[in-house]
Amino acid sequence: MQAALKLQSDDARPLQILIVDDHPVVAEGWGRIIRTKTACEIASAPSASEGWRAWRQARPDLMVVDLSIGRNKIAGIRLIERLRRVDPDLPILVFTMHRSPVLARRALMFGANGIINKDSPPAEICAAFTEVARGGNYVDSRLAMQIALLNVSRPGTSAPRLTGREEEILGMITEGMSYRDIADRACISYKTVSNVSLVLKDKLGAANLADLVVKGIRYFEGD
């Protein structure tokens, strides 16, 4: 209880925490773990948009945000980016089932204070929560090493060559847009988007759409 209590007011009101996750069971489970660490009141939101509205209404002391919400693989990152524009000091802890250092690094770049896997043991979850609650940062050592290795140049490797159209569509895919939304924005057919996506997966060596998002981010970051 020691560190998290620093966020409480002088009248010792419970810590206000907002968990944004589309799986109620996960939010409830994390809530139980956090309650073992400090006196707190926990609210939850099942989507990024509802998380934004809940933040505006409640102005919590700390937020726990799922990296991927629903089918949008980077919805959590977009929410963090939006929050940081208006509240640069809000402690934000990201939890995720993805073990991608690329997505983890992106979450940290956009303002997350910490990131942890959903299946981490309770003791590690409490450690991450405590550190972020006191205003610090938390990334487990293995993931931190993987993030650091992203900056190591790899001799003999070069980025795949993409056409202008392929880059345009890849950019929208990495933003978490659906094929239908991409088709509408680019004024092309859904089938064209689907076909280009297949080409992109082949060129970037992506196994599926989630992997394409990760490799797309790396492509634009120049890794």
UniProtKB/Swiss-Prot annotation:
Predominant location: cytoplasm
Residue span(s) of domain Response regulatory: 16-133
TM stretches of this protein: none
Gene Ontology molecular function terms on file: DNA binding
CDD domains per record: LuxR_C_like, REC_NarL-like
Name assigned to this protein: Methanol utilization control regulatory protein MoxX
Residue ranges flagged as DNA-binding region: 179-198
Keyword Phosphoprotein applies: yes
CC per GO annotation: cytoplasm
Record function comment: Member of the two-component regulatory system MoxY/MoxX probably involved in the regulation of the methanol dehydrogenase expression.
Alphabetical list of Gene3D superfamilies matching this protein: 3.40.50.2300, Winged helix-like DNA-binding domain superfamily/Winged helix DNA-binding domain (1.10.10.10)
Modified how: Phosphorylated by MoxY.
Domain HTH luxR-type: 155-220
Organism lineage string: Bacteria, Pseudomonadati, Pseudomonadota, Alphaproteobacteria, Rhodobacterales
Keywords: Cytoplasm, DNA-binding, Methanol utilization, Phosphoprotein, Transcription, Transcription regulation, Two-component regulatory system
Top-rank taxon, per record: Bacteria
GO terms (BP aspect): methanol metabolic process; phosphorelay signal transduction system; regulation of DNA-templated transcription
Intracellular or extracellular location(s): Cytoplasm
